[in-house]
């Protein structure tokens, strides 16, 4: 009998302990689920763009370097979405914040930044969405360009390296 009373008191103690926790806040979780967006193709998960060797004299009158294309390949696109835009982000240049800064170093070029252009060769400012690209079923290549541009009149030769990430936004 004593064991039964102890057991009941033990269970009551557990119940009372649970009531000691206070309700301090609420977490509301929401979102949306879309079927049939696109899959980023394996060859587009890491893209390397070679700008090549560009003569320093090319920039002497504010001219730009040549555009070098790169492609983001989407595949298995379904019919639930019709467009995609792309936002590129990275370290902005200190003078022209809409362009990528060149990584610093003892042998790095200076006075230049890297512009990212859409398929019509129009500048896409960093951290801003590109124009909308139409999607269709199957594989969809999205063409972009990287281009060296002077940001001041004191352009110095050297290595040019920069990194950017991109995010796809579907509609």
Swiss-Prot record:
GO biological process annotation, one example:
cell adhesion involved in single-species biofilm formation
Which residues constitute the signal peptide according to the record?
Answer: 1-17
What are the UniProt keywords, alphabetically?
Answer: Signal
Where are the annotated coiled coils located? none
* Keyword Transferase recorded: no
GO annotation, cellular component aspect = pilus
Q: Which Pfam families match?
A: Fimbrial (PF00419)
Task: Identify the domain of life.
Answer: Bacteria
State the conditions that upregulate or repress this gene: Expression is negatively regulated by H-NS and subjected to cAMP receptor protein (CRP)-mediated catabolite repression.
Q: What else is known?
A: The operon is cryptic under classical laboratory conditions, but is functional when constitutively expressed.
Per its database record, what is this protein's job?
Answer: Part of the elfADCG-ycbUVF fimbrial operon, which promotes adhesion of bacteria to different abiotic surfaces.
Name of this chain's protein:
Uncharacterized fimbrial-like protein YcbV
Q: What is the lineage of its organism?
A: Bacteria, Pseudomonadati, Pseudomonadota, Gammaproteobacteria, Enterobacterales
- The gene name on file is ycbV
